[in-house]
Amino acid sequence: DTYMTNQIELAAKTTKDNQTDYDGLYELHWKNGQDFNMRSSILGGELQALLEMRDGNNSENFSATLTKYTAGSAEDNTAATITLKASQADSACSDNSWNLSKLNIPESDGKLKIYNYEFQYDSFEVSVSADGSYEYTFTLKKPLNAGQSGHLDVALKRGKTTSTIGDDVGFRGIPYYMAQLNEFVRTFSANVNQIQNTGYDLYQEKGCDLFVAAPLADGTEYEMAELLYNKTEGCYYLNGEAQKGLAGADVVYTFSSK
């Protein structure tokens, strides 16, 4: 008898691929410890259909370009960071990397994949420039060791700088439609708030936001800045006022996931 069998085990994920992912989604492993390729094209059957429905993002996972990093230090209590750049002109960047209304990456517990190596991050910050380019600074959970720093050095030297979050799943599953819903809510809210901010009430007071978000922790409201790009005029509108600056110069908006 030369046949061999191996069993599949379920394990709760400790990281997320999308902003709207539920905590502890299952991933599959072979019982002998080997990785199970959930994206294999030969998987087939009900299992592949289930995974595509759960993880399908219409091949719209996040992608941007690595520009620099800091290694951090446990002794100095400094965090490691990875910086990415995204713009419409860069073909390596996904549409949702240079458009806040489409952004769908986890606030924390996400994984950056750079040159076939994964880095887990704790939070990130985005700076948007007047030319429409985005700069992401990801704060990693742990300082980088010598091997990880060397890997990033090699990636930068060889031009292997494409950095992704989540898998490319060519199916319109739950993550795709959740992202579509988020984009609609953000765009609608921003446009309505922009109209509110440019007007005045009956007491001649400047209008304020109609749509706001309240964190569950303390009940306070987020301060939402409406960032809308007008292609005709070539500038951003921030809270109803045009933000015009030299290309690549002025930062008109900064957002943090913390």
Question: What do the predicted segments below correspond to?
Answer:
Residues 1-258:
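Structural signature of extracellular appendage/secretion-system components
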